[in-house]
């Protein structure tokens, strides 16, 4: 309920099959090498559109390209579709950071387990989720398990409000 575009997704035009939006401009993956060779490379990239694990295999090659160019990259997920295999693959292609929206799953045991698995393969692993009353309650009920994952950070300071969720 507290995603950036809650209730507005049908109004957002699709990026386009095989395309990536970077800095407001759409690129085909095949053009990324050219982009990196002629423009100043970005200092960082955040993968924030929808749930990446629905088609995570499409992310591997693009993450690898930016990793090879030494661009810091982080990915947001609710974590429900992550597996050890996909988390390991993300680490192998060079993802620097993964941020789990633990509130989206109401502190699901499976997602907490995936946070621990991610720590084995990805450099920086954390929680970034809005601090809602429901999340606060669930978090404190499962606090020991969450902290036991050895995650690197917890960011619970934000709310993404729009006319559809207030």
What do these predicted regions represent?
Residues 9, 41-45, 163-166:
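Conserved mixed alpha/beta catalytic, RNA-binding, or beta-rich assembly cores of soluble enzyme
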Residues 10, 52, 80, 105, ...:
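Residue-level marker for beta-strand->alpha-helix junctions and adjacent short loops that shape enzyme
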Residues 36-107, 124-126:
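Conserved SAM/AdoMet-binding glycine-rich loop
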Residues 112-166:
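Conserved C-terminal portion of the radical SAM core fold
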């Amino acid at each position: 309920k507290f995603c950036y575009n809650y209730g507005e997704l049908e109004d957002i035009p699709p990026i386009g099959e095989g395309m990536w939006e970077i800095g407001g401009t759409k690129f085909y993956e095949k053009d990324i090498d050219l982009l990196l060779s002629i423009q100043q490379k970005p200092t960082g990239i955040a993968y924030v559109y929808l749930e990446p694990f629905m088609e995570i295999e499409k992310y591997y090659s693009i993450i690898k390209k930016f990793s090879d160019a030494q661009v810091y990259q982080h990915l947001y997920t609710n974590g429900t579709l992550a597996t050890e295999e996909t988390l390991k693959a993300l680490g192998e292609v060079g993802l620097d950071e993964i941020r789990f929206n633990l509130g989206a799953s109401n502190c699901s045991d499976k997602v907490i387990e995936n946070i621990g698995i991610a720590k084995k393969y990805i450099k920086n692993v954390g929680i970034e989720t809005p601090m809602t009353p429901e999340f606060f309650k669930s978090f404190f009920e499962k606090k020991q398990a969450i902290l036991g994952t050895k995650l690197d950070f917890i960011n619970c300071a934000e709310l993404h409000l729009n006319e559809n969720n207030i």
